[in-house]
Amino acid sequence: MSGVVLLVLAIILITIFSLIYYTIFFEFDETTFSKRLRVLTEYAKRTNADKPTPDVLGHVSDVYDHTYIVSWFRTNDLSTYHETVHDDTVEVFDFLEQQFSGAQATVTQRVAPVAAELDAFVVTNDAGDVKLRCPQNFSFDYGQLKCVPEDPCSGRPPGRYPMNELLLDTLVHNQHSDKNYSAGAHLYHPTLYLRCLANGSHAVRECPDNYTFDAEAGECRVNELCEGRPDGFVLPYFPEALLVNEFVECRNGEHVVAQCADGQVFDRALMTCVHAHPCAFNGAGHTYITSDIGDTQFFKCLNNHEAQLVTCINRAHGADGQYACSGDARCADLPKGTGQLVHIHTDDTFEYASGQMICDNYEVVSEINCDTGDVLGDKLFINKFKLNVQFPLEVLEFGACAPATLNNVSVLNDTFPIENAPNDYGVNMQTSVVGRTSMVAKLMAGDDPDTAFGENVLLARDVNTVGLNPFTAEPIDCFGAQLYDVMDAHRANVCTESGNDLLKTVEFGDGAFLSVFRDDLTGSDADYKQFCAISYESPLKIVKSDHFQRRILTNILQSDICADLYTTIYQKYTTLARKYTTSPVQYNYTFVKRPENMVVYAKNTRFKNATISEPAFDLFAAQTTDKENGFARSLFDPFADGVWRSEPGGDGDHWAPEVPPTQPEPELEPESETELDSDLELEPEFSPLILNKKDLFYSCFYELPSFKLSSCHAENDVIVDALQQLRASVKVDTECELAKDLHFVLNAYAYTGNNIGCRSVFDGDDVAVVKEPVPSYVFTNLQTQSNDGVRYNKHVHVKDGRYMACPEHLYDDEAFACNAEPDKLYYLENMQQ
């Protein structure tokens, strides 16, 4: 029992000793020890004549610009005592005095590299500049402000290189010794070698078993296998390039490749040549090569008598002697599958390196893929424009990914296409506006996106052309069968169906406008005089002028909608009952506004807002009787001699004098007042219809007129009263109950969903909101009454599932009410239908 205890105790002691030993061994830093020894030696040389060596010695061990570290170590064993961090703008360290003192002057740069000497650098101390050198096999890295090991592949082309003692210490043992390696520089490791890759990186490789690295040839060679063996001895050695009819045998103490007789193959199991198919003895899955196939091909047995030819990117030979495909297809274009492949992205506008791949023997050993995601993304500018260009977040620069800028991205074209979001009018603006690459720099600098966009675009109107080629920015006449610019809609081009030849250019003057849904692109409106034209010169202001409204005060024309509606209403509300006799003269004509200013006065009529306090005639004077209708004549008639008249279908206003009767009218016997009351009721007097002014509201999508709202002024009491009655007695179809408030504006339309379209109409008798048999328009967005989410019609309002038509300036959104003017009639027209 005592012997076992002693054995266990001995094992424990040995283990403890081993742990302590290896701890000391692995923690020992030979480089640090050498540095401290030199520091101690230098201090002793310069001070031992005056003072003894201190127990703890400090020295500046690291410098980071104005920050430096003082390392303190014990002088008896050179072990670490402690470290302190200091700022040289505050205090400096005196090595000989071993103490700190206040900084006397500010030094802008403490450490600087030496351009011609990679291992040297200059340190500026309090006494001046001192040139220092890194240890051998080190170079100074100014970016890290320290000495770093030299790159083992620096100055070497890609390939295989032998491993000397220096490479073994630094790459295998990870030790950077300060010793001199020149004595054993010609000695190399027998199987390890250095593989330098195309990108300057490196890897340590080892030859297979029974192979030795040939330093001169730079490749692994098989060891001699025939030492002490007779000639003709067949070796169980099957190198990768050995054909199916070949084998290796010994001759004169060396191994050579021999061949079987014609028609024979070498059976590696029997170790002899045989007359048989290569698959006969090995079966399915066996692989072999012949002299008539390529270096990347091999045969694979399907059964005992059939084989298929397999073609690879790279043919590999496994430890089991079988062939297999290996390698990455991406390395196939590199010589011998080895080298560096930089990925270059090229489009119509930019070119940049997006990454790189390093291949070694058809295998990818390293790969860098930068984040080339579009930094602009799917961002919309001014809520409708998208840049049809990709600018990466990162690019490859100096072998690493770096933020993309116009300095590391090549500009191939100064302009790029711009797309616009789909709209209800099908307007494609890619020929109207193109982007300038200067926009990208502004966006990358953090400028306001919309401002950067608007200030860096080229407009077709700027170069006086109908359209621009989206990719080259050159002026064009055709881009498909039709070409127009909604930002400059005073003309349009009609081209052949192929879009190659221009047929004609349509100019839009007064009364005409661009109508995108018509084959001839021409719409007509007598009131329209290019009111949607944009007068800005700044591209930023132009591209922002996507939706606006123009208001125009003008005259009611004889043939416009105001005249038609008011004439119909006037006739309805001034038509007498059968017991009255219709006056053929006064009510068969309508007073209208001439092209020039003209005032038409009503016949002896007192308006509701009249302020005349004295009578214009004697009410009790004897009245004369009109022979034509039997009614008493007016005592005051300013139109007794003539009247301005405009007949429906006539050619304007003209003066029509009254024709005197050819013979005197016989006087009628006076009748008693009682008889007049009982036999004849007098026809009531109505104020004449005066058609004078109207307000027009044109909604514009850029220079494309979309909706026209006519606000017809009523200057007649009959019309004002009629409007009040019509609005108070609106008829509504059951399906259009939610849209009943469309009645404020005639011809207003709203789609309420479920295939129901409602429209406000005047049928000659009443105002009604009716359901259309087939909806004129079906909208996916009920709130905006559009399909693209844009509210083009500013006069139709939607709130809480209810629909109202009201001039935009009269609409009360909070109360969902229309403050319609009592003396105005509103009519809405879709100009792009």
Curated annotation (Swiss-Prot):
Give the UniProt subcellular location, in the record's own words: Virion
A GO molecular function assigned to this protein is: chitin binding
- Keywords, sorted A to Z: Chitin-binding, Disulfide bond, Glycoprotein, Metal-binding, Repeat, Signal, Virion, Zinc, Zinc-finger
Disulfide bond annotation, renumbered to this chain? C207-C220, C260-C273
List the Pfam families. Answer: Baculo_VP91_N, CBM_14
Ranges where the record places region Disordered = 647-673
List membrane-spanning regions.
none
Where are the annotated C2HC BV-type zinc-finger regions? 147-196
Matches recorded under PROSITE patterns: CHIT_BIND_II, ZF_C2HC_BV
Question: What broad class describes the main subcellular location of this protein?
Answer: virion
The terms describing its cellular component in GO are: extracellular region; virion component
InterPro entries on file: BaculoV_Vp91_N (IPR013682), Chitin-bd_dom (IPR002557), Chitin-bd_dom_sf (IPR036508)
Signal sequence span per UniProt? 1-18
Which part of the chain is the Chitin-binding type-2 domain? 223-281
Family matches, as SUPFAM superfamilies: Invertebrate chitin-binding proteins
- Glycosylated residues, chain numbering: N137, N180, N199, N210, N408, N413, N588, N609
The function of this protein is: Probable capsid-associated protein.
Q: Indicate what this protein is called per its UniProt record.
A: Capsid-associated protein Vp91
Q: Which organism is it from?
A: Choristoneura fumiferana nuclear polyhedrosis virus (CfMNPV)
